[in-house]
Amino acid sequence: LGTPIDQVTNLVIERVPGGAIIRATGLTAVQGVFQVQLTPATEDETPVNGVLTYRLEGIRPPSARAVGSTHTRTVVAARALTDQELSGVRTIRVEAARNAQTSRRR
């Protein structure tokens, strides 16, 4: 577990046989953030009122500086879910420090 990434810039839900892949792109406030992941907001990774929520998090290096272009501060994290895990889910939400993005299941 890390600290929240500054912003979520893109959220894609890709259907695959047997489930889906959640892919979130984010922009960090500093360069060098590593071990970026989608962390479930609930301990058992279950939806609340049909909404499955994740936090886009990463580990900041100790001597991080807010320098560099947005390209050098862009990170991506993904998480695979089965159809069973997606049952009862109407919306997937990914939160960052300053914003959140949602995607409705079709």
Task: Report the location of each language-model feature.
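Transition segment at domain starts
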Residues: 1-17
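Gly-Asp-aromatic-enriched flexible segments
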Residues: 1-3, 32-34, 45, 103-106
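Short secondary-structure junctions
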Residues: 6, 29-34, 84-87
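N-terminal post-signal-peptidase region of extra-cytosolic proteins
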Residues: 6-9, 34-41, 74-76
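Mature extracytoplasmic domains of secretory-pathway proteins
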Residues: 14-65
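Helix-rich interaction surfaces within compact, conserved domain-sized segments
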Residues: 53-106
